[in-house]
Amino acid sequence: LSGAFDLLTELERHAPQALPLVASEMVRIAQQVGQLGRAREVLQRSYTGHPSVDIADALVQADVADGMPLRDAREGYVRHMAVEPSLIAASRWLSQEPFAQDGAHAVVQRSVEEAVRPLARYRCAACGFEAQGYFWQCPGCQAWDSFPPRRIEEL
């Protein structure tokens, strides 16, 4: 796993635009190989240059893995929304926010998640095909490298 982590950190130099695609996995592997601090540094540098909800999410994940209470770590979503307005970040922040009316939380959260779902997809620049995951080759038109490595919300 150490080799996998090293390869993922090389994306910062060779393909920084692709780092959001693997940010969460980088944190997971970093935690297993004891490199959480290094992963956080790489992600923070990338985020500073190219703010992304996926990197913000991975930074929150890294903070929690490093022992920060989720209540404090999720402030990363608020900081992201201050830089880049994001319904995806708002949804993730809201999912852990206590409501005065317990019964309302599930209904509101489900509504927000449904509204956010289309924004969290990736879209082929050639044909407009949308997918929940990133593809090197579009399943719709078969074009290669036609998916920008950013979610629809961030385009």
Summary of predicted features, one role per range:
Residues 21-22, 38, 119:
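Alpha-helix N-cap/N′ positions at the starts of helices
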Residues 16-17, 51, 85:
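Helix-capping and short linker residues that terminate individual alpha-solenoid repeat units
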Residues 29-30, 59-65, 93-99:
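Residue at a conserved register position within TPR or TPR-like alpha-solenoid repeats
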Residues 76-155:
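Cys/His-clustered metal-coordination modules, chiefly Zn-binding fingers
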Residues 40, 53-56:
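Extended, charged alpha-helical interaction scaffolds
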Residues 15-16, 25, 36:
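Long amphipathic alpha-helical segments with strong coiled-coil/leucine-zipper propensity
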Residues 21-25, 58-59, 87-94:
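"A position-specific structural signal for the A-helix of alpha-solenoid helical repeats
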Residues 1-12, 35-49, 68-83, 102-115:
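Alpha-helical repeat scaffolds
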